[in-house]
């Protein structure tokens, strides 16, 4: 159960990091 929750949180964090980096790259 915790493994699924961790994967879900990891994906959300990864998406936030990717979008954040992408915005910095565009500037």
From Swiss-Prot:
Gene Ontology, cellular component aspect: extracellular region
GO molecular function (one): toxin activity
Family membership noted in the UniProt record: Belongs to the cationic peptide 04 (cupiennin) family. 08 subfamily.
One GO biological process term: defense response to bacterium
Organism: Cupiennius salei (American wandering spider)
Residues recorded with modification Glutamine amide: 27
Pfam families referenced in this protein's UniProt entry, alphabetically: Cu
Cell compartments where the protein resides: Secreted
Record's keyword terms, sorted: Amidation, Secreted, Toxin
Tissue-by-tissue expression: Expressed by the venom gland.
Intrachain S-S bonds: none
Entries under InterPro entries matching the protein: Cupiennin
Name used for this protein in its record: Cupiennin-4b
